């Protein structure tokens, strides 16, 4: 796998947007007012799996990635990070330590990050490269809102992360 040189920048852009999505509401974006929904939080693996399944059934997702199959969501030991396992059809591992409502990874942006890995995973591409970022923007656009996708794209662009145009198109 090629060097994942934009990983930190991608995480920083997501973290910056996450604080906006935590509460949702109106955001001033270069003189325009954007309405941004509050981010979804999940209670358990069943609700995360149902959300992932619904995202993979979205028409724009199926049109762009018609050959992508389902992905299994499982609990990850520990609490430090979520991750995607590409073998055996794909597995998303989410840590659920802590009380419901306080589980940092049981949230929409973390889950969509891992779904983006599932959609574009390739040993020939960096894990957080342009194809991944384009897929993540598309997921934000169709699963959260076009405003959230615009804010993510601006954050990635500001961080110098290259994007693949075909992946980002609506």
Question: Where do the protein language model's features map onto the residues?
Answer:
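Active-site-proximal or metal-binding-adjacent scaffold patches in catalytic folds
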Residues: 1-109, 118-170
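Walker B catalytic acidic pair
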Residues: 114
């Amino acid at each position: 796998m090629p060097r994942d040189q934009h990983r930190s920048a991608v995480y920083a852009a997501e973290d910056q947007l996450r604080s906006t999505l935590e509460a949702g509401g109106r955001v001033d974006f270069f003189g325009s007012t954007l309405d941004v929904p509050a981010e979804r939080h999940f209670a358990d693996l069943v609700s995360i799996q149902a959300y992932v399944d619904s995202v993979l059934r979205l028409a724009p997702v199926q049109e762009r990635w018609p050959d992508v199959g389902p992905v299994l969501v499982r609990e990850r030991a520990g609490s430090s990070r979520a991750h995607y396992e590409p073998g055996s059809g794909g597995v998303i591992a989410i840590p659920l330590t802590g009380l419901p409502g306080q589980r940092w990874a049981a949230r929409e942006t973390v889950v969509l990050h891992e779904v983006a890995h599932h959609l574009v995973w390739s040993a020939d591409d960096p894990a957080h490269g342009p194809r991944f970022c384009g897929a993540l923007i598309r997921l934000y656009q169709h699963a959260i809102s076009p405003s959230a996708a615009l804010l993510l794209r601006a954050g990635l662009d500001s961080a110098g992360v290259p994007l693949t145009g075909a992946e980002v198109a609506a």
